[in-house]
Amino acid sequence: MGAFTEKQEALVNSSFEAFKANLPHHSVVFFNSGSVHNSVFGLIKKQNNRILEKAPAAKNMFSFLGDAVDPKNPKLAGHAEKLFGLVRDSAVQLQTKGLVVADATLGPIHTQKGVTDLQFAVVKEALLKTIKEAVGDKWSEELSNAWEVAYDEIAAAIKKAMAIGSLV
């Protein structure tokens, strides 16, 4: 991988702000795709779910999901903001330091939850689709690449921490 540029960092930062501008909506988009909205209960039924359709075992990793993705659930938005923020922070680290160091708690948490390589890939796909929706016509191959590199690096750092933790 070449050096992560200031422009790539700026692309990630600006699109992260677009994501945060409508955090409740984009949090639901992150977990759902082609969902059915039940206006009586305000819930999103898990049909064609971005993450859970592709990796059903991941449902147990998100205790706040329950039986439906509730857009009013603050834990849903909080988790999405935290995850997207980690990727944004990864972009900053890549640009300033040339490498990403994961928070020490992320390895053990992901190990405890049993996160697999497939689930990392599914989250990456959902993240990219969500950012694409958040930025609309500002989406570009360059923007996609910046998010992909930043995600891949934080995922690699978490996987490394998971591997180190399993040796202890």
Swiss-Prot record:
Nitrated in effective nodules and particularly in hypoxic conditions; this mechanism may play a protective role in the symbiosis by buffering toxic peroxynitrite NO(2)(-). Nitration level decrease during nodule senescence. Phosphorylation at Ser-63 disrupts the molecular environment of its porphyrin ring oxygen binding pocket, thus leading to a reduced oxygen consumption and to the delivery of oxygen O(2) to symbiosomes. GO terms for cellular component: cytosol; nucleus. Induction: Down-regulated in roots upon waterlogging and in response to drought in cv. Embrapa 45, but not in cv. BR-4. GO terms for biological process: response to flooding; response to water deprivation. SUPFAM superfamilies: Globin-like. The modification Nitrated tyrosine is found at residue 151. Gene3D superfamilies: Globins. The modification Phosphoserine is found at residue 63. O2 binds at residue 79. Belongs to the plant globin family. Monomer. Leghemoglobin that reversibly binds oxygen O(2) through a pentacoordinated heme iron. In root nodules, facilitates the diffusion of oxygen to the bacteroids while preventing the bacterial nitrogenase from being inactivated by buffering dioxygen, nitric oxide and carbon monoxide, and promoting the formation of reactive oxygen species (ROS, e.g. H(2)O(2)). This role is essential for symbiotic nitrogen fixation (SNF). Maybe involved in water stress tolerance. This is Leghemoglobin 5. The gene is LB5.
